[in-house]
Amino acid sequence: QGTSMLDLLRKNAAVPAGRAGMAIAVSAGNIVEVSAGLDAPAHVVIDAQGMLVCPPFVDAHFHMDAALSYGLPRVNQSGTLLEGIALWGELKPLLTQKALIERALAYCDWAVGKGLLAIRSHVDVCDPRLLAVEALLEVKRIVAPYLDLQLVAFPQDGLLRGGDGPFQHLENLKRALDMGVDVIGGIPHFERSMADGSRSIRVLCELAAQRGLAVDMHCDESDDPYSRHVETLAFETQRLGLHGRVTGSHLTSMHSMDNYYVSKLLPLMVEAGLHVVANPLINITLQGRLDSYPKRRGMTRVPELLAHGVNVAFGHDCVMDPWYSLGSADMLEV
């Protein structure tokens, strides 16, 4: 850097790959040098005291509209996914935009304090008022200077079930996209039948192709080894040329699938360029609830996915809400 003054010099830092005693130089908002023993003049000098300095954490799957709502209007007695969905349905009519914004902003403070600077949050679009969508779009605007909040239009109650008609939730989802929501979501395993689940995937992927958007679907969040919607998701991704734009979240049914079927499924996922998000804290809490013994852990097959070259990320999913009574926005815990 010669004699030029740096904006920031962070000294005595540990960085990933086990390197210690490193200095990190920042100028004009960019990291310009990382090296051992660097000692240049800077407007601000921070001694990291040997602590880890790394890129910010990313939460690839979260539900900010439900965060910090634990106990409203009651708690989940069974600890199951289905009771959590029913409980959220009881809470939705009681929601206000003010409360949604306050809880979401409080959670964003937690997240930033834990090193999270990017969150992909699903937001329920089944309420025709779209209160949660409006609230989280406002939160996204408020936190934009310091946190990248990406929103997924998520039909929590199913795309093709409920509402005032078979396509009410689809129309709500389209309205949410028009309002500025970034990604198309879905929940095929919660539709009324396997056929409707497959149909919902086809409809949503076609919408993504039309609008040039990414897809992130809750997929096969079940202990049922025959819940195989991820296969349909991979097929539609290839059919519509959505390679690299589609994510399957949860995929907990893969934990229970026959190994022969999985050996066929994994190459299909690779060909489609599917991304996968596992949510360990919530998956091991909600899955296996109907088992006697031994009880399944319910995690998808992360080692096998990685071995095949699938891009795998992790999410916190829930914090103190109808599905999970714990959580602290800590991705290291995840």
Sequence positions of predicted segments:
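His/Asp/Glu-enriched, well-ordered alpha-helical/loop segment
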Residues: 214, 235-246, 279-286, 296-334
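N-terminal metal-binding scaffold of metallo-dependent hydrolase/deaminase domains
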Residues: 1-41
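Divalent metal-coordination and catalytic microenvironments
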Residues: 13, 29, 50, 61, ...
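Active-site gating loops and adjacent loop-to-helix segments of metal-dependent hydrolytic enzymes
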Residues: 67-100, 183, 229-247, 270-276, ...
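Metal-coordinating catalytic core of metallo-dependent amide/deamination hydrolases
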Residues: 94, 121-255
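Alpha-helical scaffold segments that flank or form the walls of functional sites
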Residues: 70-122, 130-142, 171-178
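Short acidic/polar active-site loop segments enriched in Thr and Asp
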Residues: 117-118, 182, 311
